[in-house]
Regions:
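Hydrophobic alpha-helical transmembrane segments of multi-pass integral membrane proteins
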Residues: 1-143
Length: 143
């Protein structure tokens, strides 16, 4: 199967996501100290970075631009990590953070910064970190 511009598309898409992440990260950096919803968004941005990086590796290996053994192992076994980072990290955690902000805004109530919400953030971040790191260790340890 010939995919003539897949690696170019992957690199352009990766560059686009990098610019978006950089733009949002600069905005968040200037807004320090971060409110709780912004911390959720920061975790989501880290997760989308992982998902995009894995997607680029998938495309580069599929077109045979990247042929290293580590890249091939990532291509063959890292799809669950890609899904966890994309759906669990980027979409879910970012949506939770935005929901915390929007709920307070539409109810005309003050922002809630309860211990329970911080525990939710730390639990979600820890679960994502363990899943992604453990997944990489498992994939790269394959012989």
């Amino acid at each position: 199967m010939e995919l003539p511009f897949l690696s170019v598309a992957a690199l352009l898409l990766g560059a686009g996501f990098t610019l978006v992440i950089w733009n949002l990260a600069c905005t968040l950096w200037s807004a320090r100290p971060l409110a709780l919803p912004a911390r959720f968004v920061t975790t989501g941005l880290a997760a989308v970075g992982v998902a995009v990086t894995l997607g680029m590796i998938f495309a580069l290996v599929l077109e045979q631009t990247a042929t290293g053994s580590a890249f091939v192992r990532i291509h063959s076994g890292a799809l669950p990590i890609h899904i966890i980072a994309g759906l669990g990290g980027w979409l879910t955690v970012t949506t939770m953070g935005v929901s915390y902000r929007l709920l307070a805004m539409f109810m005309l109530a003050p922002d809630i910064d309860e211990k329970r919400n911080r525990v939710t953030l730390w639990s979600a971040s820890a679960a994502l970190g363990i899943a992604v790191a453990g997944g990489f260790v498992a994939v790269l340890a394959q012989v």
